[in-house]
């Protein structure tokens, strides 16, 4: 859950540039066809948690521009989340910033940089020839200065607010997907993470799950398909059957539905934790390299566990951050008990 971060990005007119539709390359068939409405393109080509902290800003844009079609530029696998935001109309499949955005030059009315404030994201948006732009202050862009050390929800809500689009950073709720919940009222133990720096040890997850299962709670282990072997290892160490492992088995909307109906979510600082926030489900969130002051949950039934005094903060490290390793099994069980799960 990272972006380019900080150099200085806004709503400003600009000279035409060359985008995917101006001769630089053909627009792929996966690009949504125009439907006659003016369009907003919000760029945030990152992961699930990054989308969820941008929801308040997206909802602000939806309210401010009810006649516009809002396209969200991000990876294709996030598509099932778009209708759940009640803000985004369609996804523009975008895998990072290495290639030009797959949209016709001059088609977009308003380009919004929710990706970061660096030269890469600005350059990709400048190429598409939008009539207006929103972003942080930087060369050629009007907008607020980039601020370090603030909550991401606040960052993006305050960005669009600066540009005249009121947004509430606590307006982060999602609609519950219209899918069957495979395990209502389960304790969801999300064992995966994008980077090793956020991987709490298998034996500790197993100890927590073993205790909660012995107390009569239904435990379900989640993660991506790539993380299924890790989830199976946790289940095995906890003495629980492979049937408790849903990692790799759930489409994204079904995963959202599982979290929306959970009795408790236990997770590192990942998309699963942000889903628990979006559905106001009780959660215990284990923080490693990312500070809770920037990525922590909103007010609600959420407990943050970490030791900031030993944080290294290397997100892309292959080894768990000391701030995460400082969290003990007993701390997690005590936090779960605080939410009525013991």
Where are each of the predicted segments found?
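Catalytic machinery of carbohydrate-active enzymes
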Residues: 1-342
